[in-house]
A protein has these predicted regions:
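TPR-repeat structural position
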Residues: 29-30, 107, 141, 180
Length: 247
């Protein structure tokens, strides 16, 4: 395993990232941030997500769900030979640093962290989903929509639930910009990938209310890439709730 690591520190750094994730779950944000900052000091300039060695492929997956999706996804893009899971360390570290900045509403720094992670792991959809969320919070709806649109469909690295989340995000941004027809279309499309999703159904109901002139205003809650809810930073009257990720 050591020969597959990007540097001599990576095995220990991967363990630190896992520890930081547990800290975040336990509400220990400052402690997690400190640990993640130690990790990113060792970030290599080049970081290979897929390594071919011994006639097999070693891929840096974020979690077991990604690994299972990749192995089971039927695509001509997939490599022949055995596929093994090795730790994804530095992109994940930047992702969770960005996540912590999102929690304290420091959206510009969150975007910067996500972009650093994306530089190392450009094919991962979570960076687009979270950057879109940050731009949405800053009121940069065009940029938010553009990030969601970068998740173009289900693929080797994009599961059905993440593509559905991108479609829901597009729909929510389009509701805010008044493009109700487009929002309705993508929200309905999202249900093809995540049938019965309460978020999509809620937003479709809200579109119906808007068309009937029953409600106005923006959300009080928005949903981040990992399924947690955050209060919206803008204080405006007559707010509603909406969500991006999962029910």
């Amino acid at each position: 395993m050591t020969s597959l690591m990007s540097n001599e520190n990576e095995e220990k750094d991967a363990e630190k990232v896992d520890q930081a994730i547990e800290m975040i779950s336990a509400g220990q944000g400052p402690e997690a941030h400190k640990l993640l900052m130690e990790v990113i000091k060792n970030t290599p300039e080049k970081y290979d997500i897929k390594i071919e060695k011994y006639g097999n492929f070693f891929i840096r997956f974020w979690d077991q769900a990604e690994f299972v999706h990749y192995v089971n996804y039927g695509s001509e893009e997939k490599d022949e030979g055995d596929i093994s899971w090795i730790p994804n360390t530095y992109p994940r570290a930047f992702y969770f640093i960005g996540f912590l900045y999102m929690q304290i509403k420091d959206f510009p720094r969150a975007v910067a962290a996500f972009e650093e992670g994306q530089r190392l792991d450009p094919g991962h959809p979570m960076f687009h989903l979270e950057k879109a969320q940050a731009y949405y919070q800053m009121g940069a709806f065009d940029k938010a929509l553009s990030e969601y649109e970068m998740v173009k469909g289900v693929g080797l690295r994009v599961s059905e639930d993440r593509y559905a989340a991108a479609l829901r995000g597009r729909g929510i941004v389009q509701i805010e910009t008044g493009d109700l027809d487009s929002a309705e279309a993508v929200l309905k499309e999202s249900l093809e990938y995540d049938p019965g999703n309460n978020i999509a159904l809620h937003e479709l109901g809200y579109i119906d209310h808007l068309r009937k002139g029953r409600h106005t205003g923006q959300s009080t809650m928005v949903e981040t890439g990992d399924g947690t809810l955050r209060p919206e930073h803008k204080e405006k009257p007559k707010k509603r709730k909406h969500f991006f990720w999962k029910a």
